[in-house]
Amino acid sequence: MQKRYLGKSGLEVSALGLGCMGLSHGYGPATDTRQAIELIRAAVERGVTFFDTAEVYGPYLNEEVVGEALKPFRDRVVIATKFGFTFGDDNKQQILNSRPEHIREAVEGSLRRLKTDVIDLLYQHRVDPDVPIEDVAGTVKDLIAEGKVKHFGLSEAGAQTIRRAHAVQPVTALQSEYSMWRREPEQEILPLLEELGIGFVPFSPLGKGFLTGAIKPGTTFGKDDYRSTVPRFAAQAIEANEKLVTLLGKLAAEKGVTSAQIALAWLLAQKPWIVPIPGTTKLNRLEENLAAADIVLSQKDTQQITEALETIKIVGERYSPEHQARVGR
């Protein structure tokens, strides 16, 4: 597996990471713990060194699974996790909380669940409008000085927030959704990250499964699958967006690869400091995704794909109104 540096931070990771959320959270019932551990370890064996989790996934369960899976390989991998919420009595209600004392409490819990003495990359999961970002960055700066955290990251933050945070504690990586069907980061965020030397970690690089071609207008999602609340996964939106799936299929056929592989290869070709983190619960999909790192798209290929994407209008918001209000702050 090829390696990449996240911006100018010196943090080196595999060109593709593994987003672990879906093993425990968000896409239906949690995967059997033993199977989840085996999948994560299979990723390590195939050269993946970058693993993404968060306390909110489960909540807590995903960190426990990741910690158990990676314990034998701790010195070979980079573990990223996130803070930023407190939870209601039922552990379902998520309340934004990035107060300094809560960040410290969250870090202690994450260290325990991840079975480690240091968090390689700690993200603020969502910007908390009630806590100045300078206070957040300052707290993480202190945690880095104390040896409990190595690198600071932000997730779904807006440009001004990134600048303000970076002025207090250098930001190693921004994690936000970026893919062929969510290209807004190209407008303002990518130029800013390049200017500041910050790496970019796209989550949902396969459009939460849509770009693989597996989701059709008749596809239904259970109540425990958060796509059931997302406007972009309503039947009418899926039907309208099938033009993108058709285009991907055509491009993939021309290269003799899969739609998922083209989608990932296109992302990797955008910038050398971009590290997508596709998730999966299946070994064959893991291997398919990782093979995308070996696909070389020429500048001409990338330009032609991008020009084709410009002709397609994506229908539907990517979040419910409640969750949409929490991004880009």
Q: For the regions a protein language model found, what residue spans apply to each?
A:
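Conserved beta-strand positions
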Residues: 18-20, 53, 121-124, 154, ...
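Active-site groove signature of glycoside hydrolases
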Residues: 111-129
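Alpha-helix N-cap and loop-to-helix initiation/capping positions
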Residues: 30-35, 61, 65, 94-102, ...
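Short, acidic/polar
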Residues: 30-43, 98-114, 158-163
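A short acidic, helix-capping loop that chelates divalent metal ions and anchors anionic groups
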Residues: 22-27, 86-93, 285-288
